[in-house]
Amino acid sequence: MKIYLATGNKHKKREMTELLPEHEIVIPSDEGIDFDPEETGKTFYENSIIKAKALYDIVHAPVIADDSGICVDAIEGRPGIYSSRYAGPDFPQGRPDGIKITQEEQNKYLISELNKALENPKPDFENFLHGKRSCHYTCAFFLYLGNDRIYAVQETFEG
């Protein structure tokens, strides 16, 4: 079966192809489809379904979509749904010009923001599940087969 993957990320396509070798996994750019839906949701779940529906409306075929990110407890869950656009504490939802920074730069900003937060700890830091540097990774995942056939899962991995 041909399944569209609602992403432009070739790495995700490779991973999904390995997980589902009996299916043809296609990303929009493989077929010249311009696909960049506005992720206006407030949760990973909402953004995932936005992407799934948007691509399904174009291809009218099975679509897999996901949205995921890291949420750091000491900095109020940032970067959260903005993980892929995160550009430091000054631009937690991404740079105004839309330019994305490298993953290495994102990591440096995130560690710097966390370290600053830990310099002035809040009383609830001790209550975090895995200590003051605790975080969790959340992934919402959809298989969209049309308005009446939707399969969804969301998992959180604590750390």
Where do the model's predicted regions map?
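Anionic-ligand binding patches
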Residues: K2-Y4, H11-G159
